């Protein structure tokens, strides 16, 4: 194998640039030519591909986002789009591909693998919702961003003696809400995987006030329902005044933490090593801090479950 391509797809996450840097430098170190594919699978179809040098990835390890840009491609879901992308790679003599993204990106990667192109997936999403890996690139940074926001909001919640509902990302997976709820000392955490009882949420708030609490923080994952609806429900049912903050896309941006830089660097280098070793149709997962290749089919056959121990712990510590 002499030429490898790399792309980022789907939602961006802090640490992707560290991964790209590792792919390029590890590849060049091993005597390979590395090609960057811009704008994800859309760029693959449109031929937005160029050779990357060591200098192409200088001064990016500390930057959020992705220098290769990203997108979601409906065209690549079609056989014609997949063939077009495959042909563009073959025309340039690219013999392997590294795809950085989430499960949707890996489904696109698997299609190319089935067409005969060696492909390795690297998990990158702030949702940390990919099965068969304990951590995905960007989750730690997003978690710290949410914690910083909680700390700041708690200051004003204390000053005004008020309830704040904070909506965080997590359409189908509540890991970001769950972990930030525990680390941020939230009074209640609502996630998509566990049905909530508003009466119990209100009871917990009132119990806190009886003990002398002057403010409360409720973390809600966007997949439960909009934070504004939760706030309205609390007001209508219990007459408790509250404010709602939607953190939105601020959770995706910003300087990656040391952890995400390390994780991205390790995963990127490992992806190159696997391609050179003849591996394909796999994602690199992490278990007990060790990197483990996992077949795409095993990733797709499972649903990421929340850590119920963390949920129980969060509940018990927020009394």
Swiss-Prot record:
Cofactor(s) the protein needs: Mg(2+)
Entry EC number(s): 2.7.1.11
SUPFAM superfamilies cross-referenced by the UniProt entry: Phosphofructokinase
Compartments (UniProt record): Cytoplasm
Activity: how regulated: Allosterically activated by ADP and other diphosphonucleosides, and allosterically inhibited by phosphoenolpyruvate.
Chain sites annotated for binding ATP: 11, 72-73, 102-105
Pfam families: PFK (PF00365)
PROSITE patterns: PHOSPHOFRUCTOKINASE
Keyword Kinase annotated: yes
Entry's Gene Ontology molecular function annotations: 6-phosphofructokinase activity; AMP binding; ATP binding; fructose-6-phosphate binding; identical protein binding; metal ion binding; monosaccharide binding
UniProt keyword Kinase present: yes
GO biological process: canonical glycolysis; fructose 1,6-bisphosphate metabolic process; fructose 6-phosphate metabolic process
Top-level taxon of origin: Bacteria
Active-site residues (renumbered): 127
Recorded family membership: Belongs to the phosphofructokinase type A (PFKA) family. ATP-dependent PFK group I subfamily. Prokaryotic clade 'B1' sub-subfamily.
Subunit structure: Homotetramer.
Annotated protein name in UniProt: ATP-dependent 6-phosphofructokinase
């Amino acid at each position: 194998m002499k030429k490898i391509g790399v792309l980022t797809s789907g939602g961006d996450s802090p640490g992707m640039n560290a991964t790209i840097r590792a792919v390029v430098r590890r590849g060049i170190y091993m005597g390979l030519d590395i090609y960057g594919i811009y704008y994800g699978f859309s760029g693959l179809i449109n031929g937005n591909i160029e050779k990357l040098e060591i200098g192409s990835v200088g001064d990016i390890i500390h930057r959020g986002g992705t220098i290769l840009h990203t997108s979601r491609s409906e065209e690549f879901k079609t056989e014609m789009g997949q063939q077009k992308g495959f042909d563009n790679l073959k025309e340039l003599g690219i013999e392997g591909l590294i795809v950085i993204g989430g499960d949707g990106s890996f489904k696109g990667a698997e299609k190319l693998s089935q067409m005969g192109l060696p492909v390795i997936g690297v998990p990158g999403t702030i949702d940390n919702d990919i099965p068969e890996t304990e951590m995905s690139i960007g989750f730690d940074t997003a978690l710290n961003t949410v914690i910083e926001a909680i700390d700041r909001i708690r200051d004003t919640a204390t000053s005004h003696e008020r309830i704040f509902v904070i909506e965080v990302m997590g359409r189908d997976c509540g890991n970001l809400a769950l972990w930030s709820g525990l680390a941020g000392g939230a009074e209640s955490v609502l996630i998509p995987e566990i049905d909530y009882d508003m009466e119990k949420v209100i009871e917990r708030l009132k119990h806190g006030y009886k003990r002398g609490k002057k403010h409360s923080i409720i973390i809600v994952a966007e997949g439960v329902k909009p934070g504004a609806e939760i706030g309205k429900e609390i007001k209508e049912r219990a007459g408790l005044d509250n404010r709602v903050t939607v953190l939105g896309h601020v959770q995706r941006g910003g300087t990656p933490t040391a952890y995400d830089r390390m994780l991205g660097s390790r995963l990127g280098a490992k992806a190159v090593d696997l391609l050179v070793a003849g591996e394909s149709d796999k994602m690199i997962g992490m278990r007990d801090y060790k990197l483990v290749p996992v077949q795409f089919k095993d990733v797709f056959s499972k649903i990421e479950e929340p850590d119920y121990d963390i949920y129980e712990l969060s509940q018990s510590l927020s009394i």
